[in-house]
Amino acid sequence: MSISSSSSSSSSSSSCLLLISLMLLAASCQGRPDLQHRNHKSQLAGLFGAEVAALLEDAGAADGSSGEEAALSQRAPPSIRALHPRSGRLGLRDDLEAEPPAENKPRRRLLKDFMSSRKMFRGRTKKMQQGRGCFGMKLDRIGSMSGLGC
């Protein structure tokens, strides 16, 4: 009997030791902020230009941006701040007041159309798409849609 009780006590002590070591390991591996991704907006502005940075900031302003985004816009590179020295940030209202160069107009318009079209299709549901006939639509075996008529 003493052999079985000693083996059970050693297994319980080893499980306690394992549990304590796991807790210490978890405490040492706490999450730390990634310093490389801290100013991602300035990196995007550097890669894709001022148009994308302006669209990102305007989308944040439309969604009710926080003070953190305002702080990020203050840390923008000097080339972006030079575009609008009075405010230090880019915005659609400022862009509409100041005419962009003719070469940037088509690109800016395409980006603006893409961003607004995404909002237009946001609320469509399955019920809204099925209202095409009195009795609905039918998918045939060959993959074509046919109305069931009135």
Curated annotation (Swiss-Prot):
Entries under Pfam families matching the protein: ANP
An individual GO BP term: blood vessel diameter maintenance
Compositionally biased tracts (Low complexity): 60-73
Gene Ontology CC annotation, any one: extracellular region
GO molecular function: hormone activity
Propeptide stretch(es), residue numbers: 32-127
Span list, region Disordered: 60-109
Keyword Mitochondrion: no
Keywords, comma-separated and alphabetical: Cleavage on pair of basic residues, Disulfide bond, Hormone, Secreted, Signal, Vasoactive
Domain of life: Eukaryota
Signal peptide per UniProt: 1-31
Known tissue expression: Expressed in brain, but not in atrium or ventricle.
Task performed by this protein: Hormone which plays a role in endochondral ossification through regulation of cartilaginous growth plate chondrocytes proliferation and differentiation. May also be vasoactive and natriuretic.
Family of the protein in this entry: Belongs to the natriuretic peptide family.
PANTHER family, alphabetized: C-TYPE NATRIURETIC PEPTIDE
Protein name (record): C-type natriuretic peptide
